[in-house]
Amino acid sequence: MKHPLLTGLLASAMLSCALPAFAGQAPFAASTPDIPLSSRDRVYAAEQFSNTISVTNPATNTLVGVIRLGEPQPVNFSPLYKGQVLVHGMGFSPDRKTIAVVSIGSNSVTFIDTATNAVKHTTYVGRSPHEAFFTPDGKEVWVTVRGEDYVAVLDGTTYEEKTRIKVPNGPGMQIFSPDGKYGYVCSSFMPETVVISVADHMIVGHVKQESPFCPNIAATPDGKQVWFTLKDIGKTQVFNARPPFEIIKTLDTGPITNHVNFAHNANGTFAYVTIGGLNQVKVFRTDDFSQVATIPVGNLPHGIWPSGDGSRIYVGLENADALAGIDTLTNKVVATIPIGQAPQAVTYVPGAVPEGDGTQNLQPLGVAGQSAHLTLRQDGAKGEGKAPTSVSLFDQGLIQILQASVTGLAPKKPYVLALASEADGKGKLEPLSAFMTNPAGSAIVNAAGPIRQIVQNDAKAQRRYLVIAEGSSAQPGAVVQRQTSD
């Protein structure tokens, strides 16, 4: 005697065992099958001061090479220079065949074939674009033009601009709901995120940001939540991805909160947030928002992206010229890979190289990996609990670009980064860059010059020491942080 119900249940169970697991990693939907990590995958990082894209094989955690989109200083000062400047933002197509790379200084989006690493097209948009991403159907590419007040909408095939969506001033980043219905655009200049209908490009929702500086936004694969970071006040906010788009949670994450992304594994779905001022990645559950881990990763973590199966998450270390790989089950760093200068956005593209070794059109790291690193601490002490100010000196020929991830100062106060004639900060100060701290008492500070030769000079009479002093360039006050030997 046959039992139709039992037979059906057994058939269903066997079928479910034969299918791949449906877990869904960002930016795809939760219903999308996981893609096991393999040597066909690539991790890309946009490197702001070497003007390169590093290409890493996650199966071996080794750098395959770099795609050079531009030259360092002083070559890019020429009025005849045609390369890209400040390579910064990045997204990829849903078929995983194309990455879109944003260069802030040259107002461009460069489209690169993942199989060959060849540039397919370059589109020039408005002033200081920040990020780009394809709609889930691949028909459009949205580019946040942060130096203005609109999103440039490009055709997903020709890459030409077809329309603009007016948004609050300074759009920081965009991401889409996994079903492709909504685009979420936060602002870096105004305290407002907008929700846009992808079908007709109309704004259908408004979300109040606790501060005006949002650099990054991400949507959970289940389509229920949107998380965005607030770099100036060190917070991360979560809102309902569906109408009425209300705020669900605000988390105090830490100074220089940079990017957020998600990984789903056997333990659940987790948000990973890079905290640049603490040199950490913090991990939160998305169901109850509890913090489950704090991961030390290295200097100034910035961009972050999960593997296609959620087993790993990769982090760009802006002031360490490196890529950190994290095992998401143990929440431990399992690899640190040297890459180019000051990595910003990071993307992980499963199956980016369908055949071959994927080394076409790549160059060795070379000068893109040359930099020096220093530390500044309060009163020259080792200090416990607070991360020190990290300083990177990125080689640009005979000079360097200095970038300091400054932490531990009073909020909303003027300071100056300077050179002191004595190691204890006494004597004459030579100002390099004046800055104002944000509400979290932190700042990103830049300068340029032959600084490495000065602060590492073996001749005592010519050597100078990096310090941070209160006040302005015209009237520097007391020294509050000094260069240390560690």
Q: How would you label these PLM feature ranges?
A:
Residues 1-9:
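Bacterial N-terminal signal peptides that target proteins for export
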Residues 13-386, 397, 427-431, 436-440, ...:
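Predominantly soluble domains enriched in secretory-pathway, periplasmic, or organellar proteins
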Residues 389, 398-404:
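Structural beta-strand segments of beta-rich domains
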Residues 406-409:
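Short, flexible loop/turn segments at beta-strand junctions in immunoglobulin-like
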Residues 413-419:
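Short beta-strand segments enriched for Tyr within beta-sheet-rich domains
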Residues 457-471:
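Short, aromatic- and glycine-rich surface loops/edge beta-strands on solvent-exposed regions
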